Amino acid sequence: VCALSEAKGMTKTMIEKIADDLIGQMTEARLIDKEMEARYVYVFICWIEKFITVGSIIVISLMFHKLFPTIFFLVFFLELRKRTGGYHLDKFYRCYLASIVSYLVIVIISEKLSEHPQWLFAIVLLAITGIGLIGTANHPNMHMTSDELMESKKSARTIVLLEGCIILGCVLLDADMVYVSYMAIAVILCAALLCIAKIFKQEVKE
């Protein structure tokens, strides 16, 4: 257990060090504003962590023979998530484990939800409504300005409406319900994380 904890700590430190070094060099070369350095470090760390997490999910999807539904899920989730924001765990390993466990749960429940589409549609409609009302959670690490937050909320509402239309179109075209369930669950998960961020006040007040 101790060895595992140390390994997790080393991973986080290594990711932060890579980000600090790279962004520091770009700041020295005047490619990045000094005032924006902290934000760029945060975004770069997010990119590395996302690469590790998404890579792991794709590998697991191959094991379950769910690669293509998973790709649809990831596209829907990542496109919406980067605009809505939402709850973040404070450590990468926690976020990573939560993501993997969440994906495994999705693999299990997607089969059940695809057999009961009325429940799936009711929940995704509620999720779309929630995102439409809230829009975006302004995470403390991003600390968006009022204009940036307004633009992000507008983008989130546009994307969730677009994704909702795609899901509806797939249903009308009688597409495989497994694919539909993965796309719908992506929207539902984004809405859930957005609501959790609001509940736990993990945001900068406007």
Predicted features, each with a name:
Residues 20-69, 79:
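Hydrophobic transmembrane alpha-helices
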Residues 99-141:
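Short helix-perturbing small/polar motifs within transmembrane alpha-helices
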Residues 139-162:
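Membrane-helix boundary/juxtamembrane motif in polytopic membrane proteins
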